[in-house]
Amino acid sequence: MADTHSNNNHVPVLFSFSVFSRASSVPVGSGYEVLIQKFLSIYGSQIDVHRKLVLQYFSEEWGQYIDLPKGFTVSEKCRLRLVPLQMDITTLGNLSPATSVFFCCDMQERFRPAIKYFGDIISVGQRLLQGARILGIPVVVSEQYPKGLGSTVQEMDLTGAKLVFPKTKFSMVIPELEAALAEIPGVRSVVLFGVETHVCIQQTALDLIGRGFEVHIVADATSSRSMMDRMFALERLARTGIIITTSESVLLQLVADKEHPKFKEIQNIIKVSAPESGLLSKV
């Protein structure tokens, strides 16, 4: 339901952030600070307060969004958006169960013979799925053209997954996924794993950061047919601000404290180290 006011002291405004837009209103004469606070009240934890952002409004004269002029105040119906600045800044990379979602990409039977260390990334991927269930983190799973390439491998337990969806696009970011994300409040971080690193993982990660999400790629749970393709994809993605990490690092960051009520269960998952394959020496 839109937050609207019927009296003449308020002006209707369409607030947009990332892929979301919401109708609301502000008092006549509202300026920069009021508008920023309104964005925070509407989108809450979806806005990473540590990032640099710019406020823009839609100019009818120019037919596009422009930066908010100095001294701007709302006097009539308008459209505003908050845009993360694409700068070479180092993300803090903090993970929290309340603001995270796991993406499992195309871990299908047909890829088993071709993908390097496929058995190892299945094992690590299953650890991540188990950890997500313990911590109550939503999981979405894609399958690339399952009619021809088969379903997700049986070793991966998809019990409780929020969404398992087919795709033909290499990126996981398709309308079905975006609709599912819109139903999960406060998502800020995506933990991404699967195949292939230089194709579907890379294109998914780039689409996600373009939409304002923080992306963590699990290096010991992603691979390709070619180790060279994998290596250069991870290097490129790291330069764009995407975090390259490991499964154990992700799970322990999510519990954060030995006193966390789920720590023992997570500890049981990582008690036996992840497979020491050739993947990590080729990151």
From Swiss-Prot:
GO CC annotation: cytoplasm
Q: Which residues form a coiled coil?
A: none
> What organism is recorded for this protein?
Danio rerio
Q: What is the name attached to this protein's record?
A: Isochorismatase domain-containing protein 1
**What is stated as this protein's family in its record?**
Belongs to the isochorismatase family.
Cross-referenced Pfam families = Isochorismatase (PF00857)
UniProt xrefs under SUPFAM superfamilies? Isochorismatase-like hydrolases
Domain of life where this protein originates: Eukaryota
